[in-house]
Structure formats: structure tokens, C-alpha cells
């Protein structure tokens, strides 16, 4: 039996309004619990369109057929008009998710975090995280115990900023296994649970065809030597590709692969490490990567 942490990122208004209810229904039918990370502030995701001038981002949008994958409402959100606030407008959906799944903060403003957090000072970052946590806690009526940085934009500055909130864990980076990042003080920080597996949009049209993805992914899961964690998006697997996701769950069950919330992957003493800026194939720009203590 192979246990895989299932992380669901919710980036947009439509992903929350349409994708999350569909995913909740699918997960309920398959008796699966997951960790769902919500963006709760304005939906300004369309402002990423300026990145089309970057060849790597343009190629990703073309090979993943982004207009079909996400829809034009997502691709244009917050461009010609102010972005709609996601959280309170979809409070009932978020509360329903929290009844059955682990719920955490993805971002206040997903676009702002992904585009600008790398240049923020620590207090700006703390204020942004606090605003998101406060909003999500108002919605679900209970403390938020986990978070996952938007776009995996995380480094030492993010690690230090999140310590102020005493969360149980964060999932801010890509890597191989859960660990504790070393703080500037030299003490271990809040546990990190890295994502170990590629997302749909990182590999489709580059490493694998859409129709072959599920078999390809299950093979990667079976070969994963660390602690497998897989991320889906409400805007993708909850919308245009929900049938592919259902097929993945069926095939996974046949192969002895089970999915669980990320917190179930925390056990025993965790190794020490750091979150450093790095790059991975299929994703434009830098992102947080796990670096084990003593390695460079």
C-alpha cells in the first residue's frame, strides 16, 4: 500500500465556486480526504498575462492549452476590472469543505504573492499572511493550522515570516520528504511538507500526452523514494479535467495507492533542512526547493 498526500490548491473565484463542489463530491464518492488550500482575497489571476512575454511561460500556456484548461474568465480576472473577492462570496462552499477535509491558507491575493512576495520586506509579508488567515478563520469559524505558499514562492524570508503564526505545518516548497527548516536563530522551524510530484500543467505536452498522464503519474508515485505528495488544482481537476481525476482515483485504488491529508504524513522526528530558491522543469520562474542540512 502506497500512501500519497493529496493537496488541492484553489487559486480563483471560479475554482472555488465551481471546482471545489465538484471535487468535494468526487472525494466523497471515493471516501478520500485531502488538504484544501484556499485563496480568499481578490481574484487578480488575469494579471499574470503580462508574463506571456517570457518564452517559458508562453510555451507552458500553449502546450497546456490554457484557454481550454482554465477558461477565459480566469485568464482575464482582475485585468480590465477589479478582481472579485473570493472568500466571503463563497463562504458556504469553504465551510462545507472544512467539515470533511483539512483546510488551510493558500493566499490572500494569489497573484500578488506569486508576482511580488519575493521582493516584499518581512513585515509586509506577515501582514499579508495575517489578512488571509484572519479571513479564512472568520469563514470557517475555527483556527487555521496549515498553509501552502501560492506558486511555491517561498524562501528563508517566507519561513521566518510564517513562524509568527504557530501553524502545525506548511507546504511551501518542492522536495522529497517532510522536514523542519532551520531558522535564522539556528532552531528548527515549523514542519514543511513538500510537494514531490509534478502537476498536470508542468508536464502535459512536454513529458506526456494528456491521455497517458494517469498511468505516467502512478508510475512516478510507485517509484517515489520519499514521501509522495501530489497537488491538483480546483481550476483544472475540478473543472475541465474532472473526469481524468476520477479515472486517476479509480486506477490508484486498483494499484494499492491511497490518498490522505498532508497532516497524516507527519510522524516521528523530522530531518533538518532549508527552503532555497530553485527551478524545476515545466514551471516558469523561481520557487522554493527543499535542501537538506549539510547539502549544497
Swiss-Prot record:
Pathway(s) annotated for this protein in UniProt: Glycolipid biosynthesis; 4-amino-4-deoxy-alpha-L-arabinose undecaprenyl phosphate biosynthesis; 4-amino-4-deoxy-alpha-L-arabinose undecaprenyl phosphate from UDP-4-deoxy-4-formamido-beta-L-arabinose and undecaprenyl phosphate: step 2/2; Bacterial outer membrane biogenesis; lipopolysaccharide biosynthesis
Lipid biosynthesis as UniProt keyword: yes
Alphabetized UniProt keyword annotations: Antibiotic resistance, Hydrolase, Lipid A biosynthesis, Lipid biosynthesis, Lipid metabolism, Lipopolysaccharide biosynthesis
A Gene Ontology molecular function term of the record: hydrolase activity, acting on carbon-nitrogen (but not peptide) bonds, in linear amides
Cited CDD domains: CE4_ArnD (cd10939)
The UniProt record lists the keyword Lipid metabolism: yes
Gene3D superfamilies xref list: Glycoside hydrolase/deacetylase
Catalytic activity reported: 4-deoxy-4-formamido-alpha-L-arabinopyranosyl di-trans,octa-cis-undecaprenyl phosphate + H2O = 4-amino-4-deoxy-alpha-L-arabinopyranosyl di-trans,octa-cis-undecaprenyl phosphate + formate
Top-level class of the enzyme under EC nomenclature: hydrolase
GO CC annotations on file: membrane
One of the protein's GO biological processes: lipopolysaccharide biosynthetic process
SUPFAM superfamilies assigned to the protein according to its UniProt record, in alphabetical order: Glycoside hydrolase/deacetylase (SSF88713)
Pfam families membership: Polysacc_deac_1 (PF01522)
E.C. numbers: 3.5.1.n3
Domain NodB homology: 2-260
Family: Belongs to the polysaccharide deacetylase family. ArnD deformylase subfamily.
Function: Catalyzes the deformylation of 4-deoxy-4-formamido-L-arabinose-phosphoundecaprenol to 4-amino-4-deoxy-L-arabinose-phosphoundecaprenol. The modified arabinose is attached to lipid A and is required for resistance to polymyxin and cationic antimicrobial peptides.
Protein name listed in UniProt: Probable 4-deoxy-4-formamido-L-arabinose-phosphoundecaprenol deformylase ArnD
Organism: Escherichia coli O81 (strain ED1a)
